[in-house]
Amino acid sequence: MAVTKLVLIRHGESQWNNENRFTGWTDVDLSDKGLTEAKQAGQVLKADGYVFDFAYTSVLKRAIHTLWGVLDELDQAWLPVEKSWRLNERHYGALQGLNKAETAEKYGDEQVKQWRRGFAITPPELTREDERFPGHDPRYANLSAAELPTTESLALTIDRVIPYWNETILPRMKSGERIIIAAHGNSIRAMVKFLDNLSEEEILELNIPTGVPLVYEFDDNMKPIKHYYLGNADEIAAKAAAVANQGKAK
């Protein structure tokens, strides 16, 4: 049986991750730590012999620059890349820019956990006049009004990510291409829920660490066989726990 591998990687720590702020579609860059995480991810992949034929990422620079860091370490900076808004982070609506711990102090840990991790729960909406509304950003000029979010749940994020997976990414994998995807916590959670057929309760507890390669292996029918992170297991567990704790009051 031939095994097809796919590598998913959440962007390295961003400036707003470092400040513990809701980011969503806000286009913040990587922190110094995030740049280092991207390079380290590339080094881990190189040490394990990974080579890629094609890459996907979002239209947000924290994911794009993570991919650059990885590919630079692999000496594959030339690799063809497709950028899509469908791989963007979940849109956090009116929470974007707010400190997560301060928001938890105001609304309670459980409410913020539901906003962050609940499957069908949307954060408070933006108005379309708000400067944070993506309709004001030229990179989304080709999107229809219906495609421009004022807030998103994970369920709504899945609604845009999985068609892109089925129509664009999966056909390349079926043709034998080796794929890496640099994306975001919730766009990756959307793919993981779909690939592993997780329940709404299971996905609530899933936290994706920053800057750590997540490998999926598929059988001949493109069904997932197993998945695993590359790197030090204790460090990865600590990173995932840190993500979970971001939304708690101090």
Swiss-Prot record:
Q: Where is this site: Transition state stabilizer?
A: 184
Q: What processes does the entry annotate via GO biological process terms?
A: gluconeogenesis; glycolytic process
Could you say which EC number(s) this protein's record lists?
5.4.2.11
Gene symbol? gpmA
From the Swiss-Prot or TrEMBL record, give the protein name: 2,3-bisphosphoglycerate-dependent phosphoglycerate mutase
The annotated pathway is: Carbohydrate degradation; glycolysis; pyruvate from D-glyceraldehyde 3-phosphate: step 3/5
Among SUPFAM superfamilies, the record links this protein to: Phosphoglycerate mutase-like
Q: Which GO terms describe its molecular function?
A: phosphoglycerate mutase activity
Pfam families, per this entry?
Answer: His_Phos_1
Sequence intervals crossing the membrane:
none
Name the family the entry cites: Belongs to the phosphoglycerate mutase family. BPG-dependent PGAM subfamily.
Q: Which residues form the active site?
A: 11 (tele-phosphohistidine intermediate), 89 (proton donor/acceptor)
This molecule's function is given as:
Catalyzes the interconversion of 2-phosphoglycerate and 3-phosphoglycerate.
Q: How does it assemble?
A: Homodimer.
For this UniProt record, give its keywords in alphabetical order, as a comma-separated list. Answer: Gluconeogenesis, Glycolysis, Isomerase
Quote the record's binding site residues for substrate.
10-17, 23-24, 62, 89-92, 100, 116-117, 185-186
What reaction does this enzyme carry out catalytically?
A: (2R)-2-phosphoglycerate = (2R)-3-phosphoglycerate
